[in-house]
Swiss-Prot record:
UniProt-listed InterPro entries: Mur-like_cat_sf, Mur_ligase_C, Mur_ligase_C_dom_sf, Mur_ligase_cen, Mur_ligase_N, MurCDEF_pg_biosynth, UDP-N-AcMur_Ala_ligase_MurC
Record function comment: Cell wall formation.
Protein's name according to its UniProt entry: UDP-N-acetylmuramate--L-alanine ligase
A single Gene Ontology CC term: cytoplasm
Subcellular localization(s) per the UniProt record: Cytoplasm
Keywords noted in UniProt: ATP-binding, Cell cycle, Cell division, Cell shape, Cell wall biogenesis/degradation, Cytoplasm, Ligase, Nucleotide-binding, Peptidoglycan synthesis
Single GO BP term: cell wall organization
Catalytic activity: UDP-N-acetyl-alpha-D-muramate + L-alanine + ATP = UDP-N-acetyl-alpha-D-muramoyl-L-alanine + ADP + phosphate + H(+)
Positions contributing to ATP binding: G115, A116, H117, G118, K119, T120, T121
E.C. designation(s): 6.3.2.8
Length: 465
């Protein structure tokens, strides 16, 4: 449906505590809408929204939605949700989160960042650059920016930067002026009936919905995007480590948790020297995508370089949380949201490069039974790269258990060599005690996953650090 601002004054948000819906609610509040919402329990997102004026109840009994002009929901809301059913009965217009976002973006020059991995950091880095360059953007990303402590902002400038979600194919609501895709991977295949080719074709459709005079920015290191690039009718800009990328990363090196590299591009006679306050080649790629877009909008180069150098990152993306005190020293605790084998691999590589002499203890909470089943072999391979694996039970994210796709099944798939350095912790609350027993001074402890593993971080550092 189209969003008519003359009649839409009150929006009700189902699952308002989720990062995506909470960011949308924040933008609506700052645009003057009355926002009500519901969720099962309070969290930092709901607390932030309540301070901004949102009216939130913590149940889904269907009583709070009846007076709204429209209701917004995410893919996390099931068809039998009482509020969703009440809205349908009351004939209240229902919009998916992505549909409402796309409606808001129509008022601006829009930039949509998609991809299986890296889209939150890239969109956050891009938003930070636009702010630093005084372009006063509106943005909505899939994580809390560490500098502003918010996933959203309403500015007075011409640009709207948003993360585009392929997990439920809702990015098809968007018709951006600039579209970015960081990579394409076999994830969220349940949305695409298990058909990777259908996923690929959906990405092509998304990119072809870019404005006729718009720009598509693709990472040429990704084999699927390399295949797609020549098929597109829009102007394409490529980036990557690949020698034939238009924006090419060269001379990459990592010093501690900082990255140094150069970008060769058709816009410059001399390479651009970039310092990034984040580790990992994957973040160098993210910064290169930002650089390509900055050139498209003719951003001031000194402002761009400053923004990349001082970008503080996104919460739960290689975030250093503190130290856990041990009897004879301390262990450093890092939290990372990555939950796909390729994301785990990138996190481990960045940590190894930052602390090559220190032991890596990876605490991994698998996310969704379906993903664990579909990528079991890939998980086994990447988890073998750590020095000690602490495996938690699968975080269901609302899915029913799948036989052969739980934590114990993953443990059984590990090799004999891996079994000697693997600990299975079925209950999250037992994790602090387990880590106290197995950790050594100077360990790097990485808490990895998109589920509720983050809830233990504060207790872990406060109790033991």
């Amino acid at each position: 449906m189209q969003l008519d601002k003359k009649i839409i004054n009150h929006v009700h948000c189902l699952g308002i505590g989720g990062i995506g819906v909470s960011a949308l609610a924040e933008i609506l509040l700052k645009k003057g809408c009355r926002v009500t919402g519901s969720d099962v329990s309070p969290n930092k997102n709901t607390e932030r929204l309540q301070r901004l004026g949102a009216e939130i109840i913590f149940n889904h009994d269907g009583t709070a939605i009846t007076q709204a002009d429209c209701a917004v929901y995410s893919s996390a809301i099931g068809a039998t949700n009482p509020e969703l059913m009440a809205a349908k009965q009351a004939k209240i217009p229902l919009l998916k989160r992505g549909e409402m976002l796309a409606n808001l973006m129509k008022e601006y020059q829009s930039i949509a960042v998609a991809g299986a991995h890296g889209k939150t950091t890239t969109s956050g880095m891009l938003s930070h650059a636009f702010v630093e360059a005084n372009l006063d953007p509106t943005f909505m990303v899939g994580g809390v920016l560490n500098n502003s402590q918010t996933p959203a902002r309403v500015g007075n400038g011409h640009y709207f930067i948003a993360e585009a979600d392929e997990s439920d194919a809702s990015f098809l609501f968007m018709h951006p002026d600039i579209a970015v895709v960081t990579n394409i991977d076999a994830d969220h295949l349940s949305t695409y009936d298990g058909d990777f080719n259908r996923l690929k074709q959906t990405y092509i459709q998304f990119l072809e919905q870019t404005a006729q005079d718009g720009v598509v920015v693709l990472c040429l290191d990704d084999p699927i995007l390399r295949e797609i690039a020549p098929l597109l009718s829009r102007r394409v800009i490529t980036y990557g480590f690949s020698s034939d990328a238009q924006y090419r990363v060269v001379d990459y090196c990592q010093q501690g948790i900082q990255s140094l590299f150069q970008i060769h591009s058709p816009q410059r006679k001399a390479p651009l020297t970039v310092k990034l306050s984040m580790p990992g080649q994957h973040n160098a790629l993210n910064a290169t995508a930002v650089t390509a877009i900055a050139d498209v909008v003719q951003m001031n180069e000194p402002a761009l370089l400053k923004s990349l150098a001082d970008f503080p990152g996104v919460d739960r993306r290689f975030t250093i949380r503190g130290e856990m005190i041990l009897p004879k020293g301390n262990a450093l605790i890092i939290e990372d949201y990555g939950h796909h084998p390729n994301e785990i691999k990138a996190t481990l590589a960045a940590a190894r490069a930052a602390w090559p002499e220190r032991r890596m203890v990876l605490v991994f909470q698998p996310h969704r039974y379906s993903r664990t089943r579909d990528l079991m072999t890939e998980f086994v391979s990447v988890l073998a790269e750590t020095d000690w694996l602490v495996l938690l039970e699968v975080y269901s994210a609302g899915e029913m258990p799948i036989p052969g796709a739980d934590g114990m099944a993953l443990i059984k798939m590990m090799s004999n060599g891996m079994a000697q350095k693997t600990t299975f912790v079925p209950l999250l609350q037992n994790l602090p005690e387990t880590l106290q027993k197995l950790s050594q001074p100077n360990d790097i402890i990485i808490l990895q996953g998109a589920g509720n593993i983050g809830s233990i971080v504060t207790a872990l550092v406060q109790t033991y650090g």
